[in-house]
């Protein structure tokens, strides 16, 4: 996967993986043990933070629902997406597939096919939907064998190779495998706590619309950028979810958590035009 060398002042940025209050829990973890929801951030708050952090377009990829994303669907710089839980047919193995720029009919059709990864891949291919394998080396259910990963590389040319939720131990093999097989690498924060939105993102050449941005991704003109995950970020996210779940929400504490998160590196100013 060769670098596209996108000039920073000319690119368009999107955090291609983040969650709102609409997300459903998909796997037991510390949040479930503490009786916390999967996410407690309203879609409008995600949009506002993404824009403050320099994202040109915004999307929300909730687990198996587009209810949160539809609340922002009328905004011209927003596109509806979903993190689809997909199974290998007749096997106890699941993966998550990010489906971008979809509509309610696509959502329904994808849910109907979610029990068969081959059927999902055929649908997104036929519809021209940009779809990416999320966190490829995180085990959603049973571990994947090499044959599964090879097939996934064939079915989904786009992989999430930089996650703001998972660290180098899972991101590095995803990048190496994708480069060995060919294809496109993207990045997203996978933010559940509402404080790391926009700190991990995908950049393409300048796009004038969400459709053009996704067209660049489809064409391989995309670069992953930003933070990777670590224990501190996981602790911050879990605390933020818990605080948002309390009566009155995050309030000042949430603002303090968000203010401690590093900022996206600024775009350099354009060079002055010669006289």
List PLM regions with ranges.
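Charged catalytic cores and adjacent phosphate/nucleic-acid-binding surfaces used
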Residues: 1-36, 67-77, 86-107, 122, ...
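Active-site flanking residues adjacent to catalytic metal/cofactor-binding acidic residues
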Residues: 16, 61, 82, 134, ...
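Divalent metal-dependent hydrolysis catalytic cores, especially in the metallo-beta-lactamase
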Residues: 33-39, 44-64, 129-132
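Amphipathic coiled-coil/heptad-repeat helices and related helical stalk/stem segments
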Residues: 42-43, 113-117, 144-145, 170-171
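Generic structural signal for well-ordered alpha-helices
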Residues: 47, 66, 118-121
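Internal catalytic-core helix/loop-beta-alpha segment
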Residues: 109-143
């Amino acid at each position: 996967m060769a670098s596209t060398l996108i000039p920073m002042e000319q690119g368009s940025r999107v955090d291609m993986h983040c969650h709102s209050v609409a997300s459903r829990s998909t796997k037991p973890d510390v949040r479930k043990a503490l009786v916390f929801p999967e996410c407690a951030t309203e879609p409008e708050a995600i949009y506002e933070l993404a824009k403050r952090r320099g994202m040109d377009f915004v999307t929300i990829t909730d687990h198996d629902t587009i209810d949160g994303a539809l609340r922002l669907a009328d905004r011209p710089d927003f596109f509806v997406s979903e993190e689809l839980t997909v199974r290998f047919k007749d096997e106890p193995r699941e993966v998550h597939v990010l489906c971008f720029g979809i509509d309610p009919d696509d959502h329904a059709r994808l849910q109907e096919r979610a029990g068969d990864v081959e059927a999902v891949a055929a649908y997104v291919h036929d519809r021209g939907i940009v779809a990416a394998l999320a966190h490829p080396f995180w085990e959603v259910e049973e571990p994947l064998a090499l044959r599964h990963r090879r097939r996934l590389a064939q079915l989904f040319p786009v992989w999430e190779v930089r996650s703001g939720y998972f660290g180098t131990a899972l991101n590095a093999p995803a990048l190496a495998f994708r480069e060995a097989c060919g294809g496109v690498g993207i990045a997203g924060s996978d933010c559940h706590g509402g404080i790391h939105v926009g700190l991990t993102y995908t950049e393409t050449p300048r796009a004038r619309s969400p459709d053009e941005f996704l067209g660049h991704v489809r064409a391989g003109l995309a670069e992953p950028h930003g933070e990777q995950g670590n224990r501190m970020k996981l602790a911050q996210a879990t605390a933020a979810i818990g605080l948002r779940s309390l009566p009155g929400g995050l309030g000042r504490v949430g603002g303090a958590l968000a203010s401690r998160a590093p900022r996206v590196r600024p775009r350099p100013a354009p060079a002055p035009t010669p006289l």
